[in-house]
Amino acid sequence: MKVRPSVKKMCDACRVIKRNGRTMIICSANPKHKQRAGK
């Protein structure tokens, strides 16, 4: 999982979700695309 100040979709399969007030990207096609915003 990458932790970044700002998260962006890397492909069409990426989905933006919010968990515990944090924005996250999950991807069914490529698990390398998983990201989380913030500290």
Curated annotation (Swiss-Prot):
The keyword Secreted does not apply. One of its GO terms (biological process) is translation. GO terms for cellular component: cytoplasm; ribonucleoprotein complex; ribosome. It comes from the Bacteria. GO terms for molecular function: structural constituent of ribosome. The keyword Heme does not apply. Keywords: Ribonucleoprotein, Ribosomal protein. InterPro entries: Ribosomal_bL36, Ribosomal_bL36_sp. Pfam families: Ribosomal_L36 (PF00444). HAMAP family: Ribosomal_bL36. Belongs to the bacterial ribosomal protein bL36 family. This is Large ribosomal subunit protein bL36.
